[in-house]
Amino acid sequence: MTGYQLVKYLTSAKYDSYQASTSDLPLFRAAEVLLNYAEAKAELGTLTQDDIELSINPLRERADVADLSLTEANAHPDPYLASAETGYANVTGDNKGVILEIRRERTVELLME
């Protein structure tokens, strides 16, 4: 534990009450659109490295995380994410590794929303 408190969407009590709030809450973030795009292309079997460069990698670059490689992800699917106990055991096929990585990215990106 770091001791840091989550302050996402937190506003002053001066502006919020039991019956009303002036805080805008995005219902669909641009990051979620990019993740949905990449996952849909991967599930259809049409995902390319160019698609990853337009969708997943900008999200990872913003967090200073290494770029995702389609070839590398599919060559070495994460066993933790593929496990029936801890992940998505139902994911199969040629794009198994990259689908698992996209789902991990979604978990990280949308945490606490």
Predicted segments with their positions:
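Acidic/polar-rich alpha-helix caps and helix-coil junctions
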Residues: 1-113
